[in-house]
Amino acid sequence: MNVTVMFLVLLLTMPLTDGFNIRAINGGELFGLVQRDAGNALDHGFYRRGDCPPWCVGARCRAGKC
């Protein structure tokens, strides 16, 4: 029972942790976008590297292009 509860808590908090890590890296400008796309590993990678132009929003950004 306790293991199951801990597993569920871990699953629920992982996207939040990832969002806060990215917020710390890029100064928080994309925090809202990252929270919305928390499950999209590709978007996270592009946000971390800073390849996206500022006018790209969310999932439209691929390899630095809209």
Swiss-Prot record:
GO CC terms: extracellular region
Compartments it resides in: Secreted
UniProt tissue specificity: Expressed by the venom duct.
GO molecular function terms attached to this record: toxin activity
Membrane-traversing stretches: none
Propiece residue ranges: 20-47
Name by which UniProt lists this protein: Conotoxin Cl14.1b
